[in-house]
Amino acid sequence: MGSVCMRLWAYLQPFLPCWSQEADKSVVIENPGAYCPPEANRSQGQYFVALFDYEARTAEDLSFHAGDKLQVLDTSHEGWWLARHLEKKGPGLGQQLQGYIPSNYVAEDRSLQAEPWFFGAIKRADAEKQLLYSENQTGAFLIRESESQKGDFSLSVLDEGVVKHYRIRRLDEGGFFLTRRKTFSTLNEFVNYYTTTSDGLCVKLEKPCLKIQVPTPFDLSYKTVDQWEIDRNSIQLLKRLGSGQFGEVWEGLWNNTTPVAVKTLKPGSMDPNDFLREAQIMKSLRHPKLIQLYAVCTLEDPIYIITELMRHGSLQEYLQNDGGSKIRLTQQVDMAAQVASGMAYLESQNYIHRDLAARNVLVGEHNIYKVADFGLARVFKVDNEDIYESKHEIKLPVKWTAPEAIRTNKFSIKSDVWSFGILLYEIITYGKMPYSGMTGAQVIHMLGQNYRLPQPSNCPEQFYSIMMECWNVEPKQRPTFETLHWKLEDYFEPDSSYSDTNNFIN
């Protein structure tokens, strides 16, 4: 029971306020990514170090490079701080020495968060994925907060294509150790020592793991924090990415600087007032596995919805185009785990998606998957044989919708769990249509007979059992997304193990 509580705390901690860490016409909010901004002291002149490169999006922004030193002057704008660059001749900075910066791109100077090897509260599976990027070599390493032991840390090291993990334990009197015969006052001392000798590790520490997953700023710029409706002339449509019954999706450019995705909606596909009411809620939802809404243009047709750009399109297309040639079970489970992570956040916010499906999950660089279009099902107007229209004018994609939602028009996070089970079917079958050959009416009839999709031929029993849990006829008996996330994170390692330093001591 204790371990469950610790895992629950480790899961919830990232969603608590970040006390532990952490032009232009335009838009709204964006996703904070995997890094939470530090708490800045309101006093003038606090010093910070840049964790990532940032190129100014507006004339008021400040460009900088990873490792640059910055003096923060004002933190009154949420997500955007006024800062001064302390290195006057930084490459590519020109004459701009003061401006606004995204707060989740910096950490307080000389803090643990500022160290290139510290990755914060990422999970074991994510540590492995990042270390296994081809850009990293043997000896690449990172230190992260322990998932199971609050206040402790874990060391993850790449050794000839295999990631090994070590518990960094604390001394009662302060300090850290792997083995008690060698202790350290600080983590910096720990890292400095093991970069000179392996001494119990599988390999000597070399370069820190590259931080390839760059967080997304909270908004397009500091001026757009409180703006919602933007001038459509600030948006350029560059390349059509796809089309559907609601309209088209384009790759676009905001303010001649920032790549975005733009949904252009067919006239009459939604009521602008209904959408804006829903959008006020949607824009406040921030999580690394959710597509964050940036802005809208609703004053004339076509309505524009501006979001973060995910260059590989929908998960449905991604799966269908691959057809199993490269994607294997490990990546399929990772897809499902990332979606479950985003949905667990919506669950924690008491928010319901209503249209969870592979077509509404987007694929980015480095195998990143994010949930999109949450909440939009309430405002779209559709006419399709596979859509169930209730007497209350709620439209349902029948093949993804829970029986009780079809029957009573009552949605809950548990009806989203049912849809997640259908999404798992799409993932494991490389994007096949569920209930292939059946009409929406036939599906409704079969569900009434307690029919469930059969186990696909290439689907492991363990994966199918998770699907079946999602399709429990009793909504209350379906797992939470929090539980689904844990199950998928631990799919290949139900008993997480750490390497023993004694195995490597000569």
Swiss-Prot record:
The active site is at D355. SUPFAM superfamilies: Protein kinase-like (PK-like), SH2 domain, SH3-domain. Residues 117-209 form the SH2 domain. It is found in: Cytoplasm; Nucleus. One of its GO terms (biological process) is cell differentiation. Residues 235-492 form the Protein kinase domain. Highly expressed in stomach, small intestine and colon. Concentrated in the brush border membranes of epithelial cells, throughout the maturation axis of the adult small intestine. The modification Phosphotyrosine is found at Y388. GO terms for cellular component: cytoplasm; cytosol; nucleoplasm; plasma membrane. One of its GO terms (molecular function) is ATP binding. ATP binds at L241, G242, S243, G244, Q245, F246, G247, E248, V249, K263. It is an enzyme of class 2 (transferase). Residues 43-111 form the SH3 domain. Pfam families: PK_Tyr_Ser-Thr (PF07714), SH2 (PF00017), SH3_1 (PF00018). It catalyses: L-tyrosyl-[protein] + ATP = O-phospho-L-tyrosyl-[protein] + ADP + H(+). CDD domains: PTKc_Frk_like (cd05068), SH2_Src_Frk (cd10369), SH3_Src_like (cd11845). Keywords: ATP-binding, Cytoplasm, Kinase, Lipoprotein, Nucleotide-binding, Nucleus, Phosphoprotein, SH2 domain, SH3 domain, Transferase, Tumor suppressor, Tyrosine-protein kinase. The modification Phosphothreonine is found at T179. Its EC number is 2.7.10.2. Interacts (via the SH3-domain) with PTEN. Interacts with RB1. Belongs to the protein kinase superfamily. Tyr protein kinase family. SRC subfamily. Non-receptor tyrosine-protein kinase that negatively regulates cell proliferation. Positively regulates PTEN protein stability through phosphorylation of PTEN on 'Tyr-336', which in turn prevents its ubiquitination and degradation, possibly by reducing its binding to NEDD4. May function as a tumor suppressor. This is Tyrosine-protein kinase FRK. The lineage of its organism: Eukaryota, Metazoa, Chordata, Craniata, Vertebrata.
